[in-house]
Every structure is written in C-alpha cells, then in structure tokens.
Amino acid sequence: VAIEQLEQYAPEVIDSFKELSKTGSVEFLAEPYAHSLASVFDVNEFERQVKMHADKLEQLFGKRPTSFFNTELIYSDEIGEIVSKMGFKAMLIDEAKHVMGWKSPNYVYKHAYVSKLKLLVRNHKLSDDFAFRFADLSLTAEKFISWIAGLPAEENVVNIAMGYEVLGV
C-alpha cells in the first residue's frame, strides 16, 4: 500500500503532503485501502477498505476526504450509489468515450439518479500527456499549459489524474 510505504521509507513525502494539506487547496481522495477490485466483487469489503483509507487520511492530514477515487477509476451507477451512501460528495471517474460520446470531460457531471454525487471526469488525453510525455522531455510545461489555456472558456474544470508510479513511487 503506497501510503504505508511512504510512511516507512519516505516520511518526508508524507510531511510534504501535510504541508500541502495545510494550504486548504488540496484534498486527498479516499480509495480502497489495498487498491483492490472489491467494488466489483464484495460491497462489504469495499466499504471496509474505503473507511480504512479515509480514516488513515484523516489521521495523517487532519481532514476526512469528501471525494473518492476508485481503483483504476472503475465506475458504475451502482458503485456511485454506494460511494454516495458512504458520505462522499464527489467521485473521480475515467473518460469513457463509449459512454460520453461527444461530451467533454471538462465539466462537472452528476450521478444518473443520485444527483448529490458529483462526477469529476479524468481528462484522458491531458492526463496521459502529463504522465507519459513529460519524462522524455517531448512535452514542456509551457506547451502543456498552452493546451489547457486553449480550451473553450466554458470548459473550466480539467481533472488530471495518474497513479503514483508516474512519480516513481
């Protein structure tokens, strides 16, 4: 589990996260503790792991998460309903072209029948560009920022998400 590895082998990273948390501009998202597929196979185990992770984040950073990130961004309306019942206000989901069609990921959406759950859609293209093209220097910060600045004005939410492995963790 990444958070346990950071605590044991890189406590300075946890300390830097604590400093980020103090700014009030960052929220750490809850997820299944073991990065498991429990949301698909075992609701009770899923809820147990999510609570365990939310408890750990609250213990470390002094704030209980209100947003959720499922393993590999797995989503269904049923999973969203469970997440909402657990008290989360928002869930980060992947941009599924076969579902979204022409819709942009750069808006806040809502659950199909639990309207209080906000759905934040990962911008697949920008996330992958950041994750895979910065490291080999084929993408510069200036170019990346220009892409975001070039989005239509009404598309004012851009969610970039990637795993810790991108950062070498």
Per-segment meaning from a language model:
Residues 154-162, 167-169:
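Active-site-proximal acidic segments at structured loop/helix or strand boundaries
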Residues 72-76, 165-168:
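Gly/Ser/Thr-rich loops at beta-strand to alpha-helix junctions
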Residues 130-133:
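Conserved NTP-donor binding/palm subdomain of two-metal-ion nucleotidyltransferases/polymerases, i.e.
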Residues 68-71, 160:
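Short, conserved catalytic/metal-binding motifs centered on acidic residues
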Residues 1-66, 73-128, 138-155:
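Catalytic alpha-helical scaffold of carbohydrate-active enzymes acting on polysaccharides/glycoconjugates
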